[in-house]
């Protein structure tokens, strides 16, 4: 599942939760999807930060 599909499904589950509530399986799915989203976000941020070099290195 790509990040756009992941976000879309999380949003669908959130909307359903607010409107009518979630089943136990849907609640578990939402939590797993949120964890996956956060892990991907962290991974992408780490990779971006690896490529950043400070302008003035102080010793």
Swiss-Prot record:
Location of this chain's protein in the cell: Cytoplasm
Any Gene Ontology CC annotation: cytoplasm
Chief place where the protein resides: cytoplasm
InterPro entries: DUF896 (IPR009242)
Keywords recorded for this protein, A-Z: Cytoplasm
The family this protein is said to belong to: Belongs to the UPF0291 family.
Name of the protein in its database record: UPF0291 protein CPE1003
Species, as recorded: Clostridium perfringens (strain 13 / Type A)
The organism's taxonomic lineage, starting at the top: Bacteria, Bacillati, Bacillota, Clostridia, Eubacteriales
């Amino acid at each position: 599942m790509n990040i756009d599909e992941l976000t879309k499904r999380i949003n669908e589950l959130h909307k359903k939760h607010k409107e009518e509530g979630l089943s136990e399986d849907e609640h578990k799915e939402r939590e797993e999807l949120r964890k996956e989203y956060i892990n991907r976000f962290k991974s992408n941020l780490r990779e971006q930060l690896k490529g950043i070099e400070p302008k003035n290195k102080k010793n």
